């Protein structure tokens, strides 16, 4: 397995990759708002157990042990999960992908997620058992889990990739940590650590002063 990263122009603010650029190919699960189409009533992210969850922008729907969606409106989507148990979901438009939440405490949300794809891949998000000890893949706002970035991905043959991040004080949420991808370790196999790695480095964010439709350093 090899990482598949890409530079994407979003037109957004000045960030680590420069004005308007973002890094693609980094999967994540994050809190998202309820919608009228799915939940009957639109909502907003409140950083509570009642928040909804999305995998790469696609809504996760709670299901029972047979994979049947629970009755709507669903509750506790973003709640922590008791030790030895899990909560199961399906992506809204992909019934063949199985998502489970594990761990966590109080109202802080799950500790990690495991995602099984139809092609045999197992992808882990957050502070999962297979994550590198310094992965920092669960991102918090005042202790509450805000997003869970991919920490490990493995194929059906046991080949795997690990992802490591930096957390820093940001501006997206009240008292929140933001994150950047620092390193990708790949060519790992069952019983053998990855022998190759991709390290992302930068010279800092270049700021600019904008006037009408032009910028100057």
Q: Where are each of the predicted segments found?
A:
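Conserved catalytic cores of ATP-dependent inositol ring kinases
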Residues: 1-217
